[in-house]
Structure formats: C-alpha cells, structure tokens
Amino acid sequence: QGYSTVAFDGPPSYGHAPSHHAAQFSNHSFKHEDPIAQQTSLGDQQYSVPPPVYGCHTPTDSCTGSQALLLRTPYNSDNLYQMTSQLECMTWNQMNLGSTLKGHATGYENENHTAPMLYSCGAQYRIHTHGVFRGIQDVRRVPGVAPTIVRSASETNEKRPFMCAYPGCNKRYFKLSHLQMHSRKHTGEKPYQCDFKDCERRFSRSDQLKRHQRRHTGVKPFQCKTCQRKFSRSDHLKTHTRTHTGKTSEKPFSCRWPSCQKKFARSDELVRHHNMHQRNMTKLQLAL
C-alpha cells in the first residue's frame, strides 16, 4: 500500500552512447513511494509520448558520492549528451524516494547527505510511472531544457529550481511552465494562433494572444480610477497613472544585469533591454 511499481524494459535506440554508460539491463526492480499515485489517470491523459529514460553513471571527482541524472529521449538523440551535460549532480530530497534503493544497493551510500539519493549502478532504466516524476516528464517536451533540483536538505528553499540549458542561457524559474514558455524564445515555437478572420498571427504565450485579440475586439479592461480612461494593457495604465501622481519621470524597473544601472518606466521596456543583454551574451558564448 502506498507504493507503485517501477519496471524496467529493453533499451531504446540511440544514435550513439558514451562508453561509460552500460547498455545492459539486468533484472533490476524496486518500488518507490508515489505520493501522487492516485493521480496516475490524470498523468496518462497529460503525457501522450513514452516516458523518458533515466540512467546513472559513476560519480565524477566533482560530484563524489552524488548522482548525475541523465535525461534522455529518443526524440533528441542528436544533441542528447550535450543536453545532459547541463544537468547538475542532484538528490531527490523533495521527492521522498527513500524506498527507491530497496533491493538496489550500490555501495555509494554517503552518510553526509540527509536526503535520499540515486546512486551509480551502470544500468539504464525506462521508468513507467507518473506521480513524483511528473515534473521531469514535462521537461522532455521542451528541447534543450534540463531541470535543476535542489541537492541537499539545506537547499530546499531554492526559489528557482528549473534552469534553462540552452547554451549561454542560465535563466532560472520557479515553475516548470515558466521555463517552458521561456524555452520558446530559443526554439521559436508559437503554439497560440489568433482565430480572427484574416489574422494568422501566432504567439509563444497565451497572455500575448489575449492582449493581441483586444486589438480586434477593442476591449480595454484596465480603467484609470482618477479620469476613467481605459487601456488594453495594465502596464499602460500604470504609466498613465503617473501623470496624476506627478511621477512622470519615475522609472521603477531596474536592470538586474551585472554592472548595468539602467532603469525603465515600463516593464516591457525592461524586458526588451534584458533580451538585448541576453543576445549579446549568446553571441559572445558562440564566438568563444
């Protein structure tokens, strides 16, 4: 009771595999606590592609006693190991996987860590489960994105556990959905299309689509309490409100980029400015 079985089957087909990854599948089997086991039917509806494959490798000098988790999918075989190299050594202290190691001892136990860990064993597993792995399963749908999970009990207050693994971009986010939206800047994906007649514009975020559609409908939901003037965007209302307060020169949005002190009156101006920094950084990384 309270456990769901984790089964392993044959190896997937990959274009290549590094020598330190064993391609053998022994009769490994174990169970893990799945606090969201009752929601597996929801998971089945949410994920239409096969679960990702997880593997483990001998800990390197930089992560002795820890486990580097490899996220691999048959849909990303070309830059598979470039992507996994972005992953940090991690523990699963937030996911309550203490029982994962039952019947799967490997000799890498580390008493310095209070949180349960995944240990190196030289095997690859196809994990058939939802629940605690749901957040990581979402990642497989985002090309070039890897999750960063807190590595010890003392780091459970990590505010932004999901990090973009795109080369030259290390932005972190609190929610996986925010990381997914960000990743579309790199992939160019725009899944939201305007359905108004003769308009085929597409957007990477649903809120951008809603804002765009107000141009068609003329809806202006944001009203100034002082003069009753209406606006289609909340940031435009905030900028307008400063004309009543006498703070027209106020610039509350500051650039957080190192050694940059620029400030802006509107948040969208700050976003464009940050994007400029990011583009310059990416160009520099590629040049090196």
Curated annotation (Swiss-Prot):
Pfam families: WT1, zf-C2H2
Molecular function, one GO term: hemi-methylated DNA-binding
SUPFAM superfamilies: beta-beta-alpha zinc fingers
Span(s) of short sequence motif KTS motif: 247-249
Keyword Mitochondrion: no
ZnF bounds (C2H2-type): 162-186, 192-216, 222-244, 253-277
Principal location class: nucleus
Subcellular location, record wording: Nucleus; Cytoplasm; Nucleus speckle
Sequence motif: 9aaTAD, positions: 90-98
GO CC, any one term: nucleus
Superkingdom, natural source: Eukaryota
GO BP: any one term: positive regulation of heart growth
Region of interest called Important for interaction with target DNA, as start-end residue ranges on this chain: 206-220, 232-240
Chain residue ranges for the region called Disordered: 1-21
Misc: Presence of the KTS motif hinders interactions between DNA and zinc-finger 4.
Similarity-based family: Belongs to the EGR C2H2-type zinc-finger protein family.
Domain notes per entry: Binds to DNA motifs with the sequence 5'-GCG(T/G)GGGCG-3' via its C2H2-type zinc fingers. Starting from the N-terminus, the second zinc finger binds to the 3'-GCG motif, the middle zinc finger interacts with the central TGG motif, and the C-terminal zinc finger binds to the 5'-GCG motif. Binds double-stranded target DNA, irrespective of the cytosine methylation status. Has reduced affinity for target DNA where the cytosines have been oxidized to 5-hydroxymethylcytosine, 5-formylcytosine or 5-carboxylcytosine. The 9aaTAD motif is a transactivation domain present in a large number of yeast and animal transcription factors.
Database matches in PANTHER family: KRUEPPEL-LIKE FACTOR 11, KRUEPPEL-LIKE TRANSCRIPTION FACTOR
Role this protein plays: Transcription factor that plays an important role in cellular development and cell survival. Recognizes and binds to the DNA sequence 5'-GCG(T/G)GGGCG-3'. Regulates the expression of numerous target genes. Plays an essential role for development of the urogenital system. It has a tumor suppressor as well as an oncogenic role in tumor formation. Function may be isoform-specific: isoforms lacking the KTS motif may act as transcription factors. Isoforms containing the KTS motif may bind mRNA and play a role in mRNA metabolism or splicing.
Protein name, entry field: Wilms tumor protein homolog
Organism per entry: Alligator mississippiensis (American alligator)
